[in-house]
Amino acid sequence: TTDNTINIGGVTVQGEGNMSGVKIEPVAIANNKPVVNVPLPDLNRTIKITANMDENAKKIATAKIQDLSSQLKKDSDNLENWLVLGVYRKTIGDYESAREVWEYASAIRPKNSVSFNNLGELYAYYLKDNAKAEENYTKAIENGPSAIYIYRNFFDFYRYFMKDTAKAKAILEKGITANPATSSDLKNLLKSLQ
């Protein structure tokens, strides 16, 4: 291969081959962070608990949601706080808020696996949208191929929601291939399908 240099819009790019697929796109930056094209979830949203919880659990969840929301108003780039806020919103039965929070987390950190796994579960178990569940589980595995628990969750989705044993088996095999030394749980599940 030969080294090539091309100039695209005043930017010099070096690479190998004919570089016909090279593309440069502008990225909007504000406060040294890429601008996300997803609206910030409403951090002042009313806390409405619809889940069956005892009073103490309700108080704890409410306090955690208020605290996390307050922290996120100061630093909306904190992935961990978005992930935990989504968990608390889901716990109280506010699935739409959990979805918004995890979609935002996925937008600000498109290479993380946790928010996509959480969305997969949310869409499968609570929002009853199998296409969105599959899409998010697929992205979670793409982003976190060594996270065994995601393969397990995706397997459960295929087996119990989609009733598709072939896809359930295929996702286990994919996880085993990607993680030969750490996939004993997946191997046992695969044996149970035989």
Enumerate the language-model features and the residues they cover.
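Long, contiguous interaction/recruitment modules in multidomain scaffold/adaptor proteins
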Residues: 1-73
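Structural signature of tandem alpha-helical TPR/SEL1-like repeats
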Residues: 57-70, 92-104, 127-139, 162-174
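Structural marker of alpha-solenoid helical repeat scaffolds
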Residues: 74-75, 108-109, 143-144, 178-179
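Residue-level recognition of tetratricopeptide repeat
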Residues: 78, 87, 112, 121-122, 147, 156-157, 182-183, 192
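TPR alpha-solenoid repeat register
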Residues: 81, 115, 149-150, 185-186
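Canonical tetratricopeptide repeat
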Residues: 84, 118, 153-154, 188-189
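Extracytoplasmic/luminal low-complexity segments enriched in Pro/Gly and acidic/polar residues
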Residues: 102, 169-175, 183-194
